[in-house]
């Protein structure tokens, strides 16, 4: 893993957080307990704070960044899919951000939300708890069912277990 201090500010990682070797975590970043940052991810806290909550997973190829005065806050047990771009936004607990989605500065995603694959959440847009959010520009199309919300929770739990599997068994052979 590549963990970088920048301007005297080093990332703060809980001992149970797992960061893949090819991921980069830079500057003013906090990773809470049971977080996982997967291969090829960049979490760059150079202009403002980035906080990633307990049990959250940031999947392969994603980029997390913030602008000055616009921190990035990700709640607990959030699943951030492959190649997601999060920039200066707020993501509520137990939400799922689908593959390739983009969430821009000042946007707020409520708790228990599903942002569909490829969605573009524009600057300052806010969505209430339990929303299914799709499209470009993104719109809330309906509320999630209790079964769908449980599926979001299962995804986060799976990645906590998968990170433990990688911590215990990943061995570089070449």
Name every feature range the model reports, one short phrase each:
Residues 1-13, 18, 46-49, 54, ...:
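Glycine-rich hexapeptide-repeat left-handed beta-helix
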Residues 34-35, 52:
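Short Gly/aromatic-enriched secondary-structure transition segments
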Residues 23:
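Compact, Lys/Arg-rich rRNA/RNP-binding cores from ribosome-related proteins
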Residues 26-32:
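N-terminal glycine-rich anion-binding loops that anchor highly charged ligand groups
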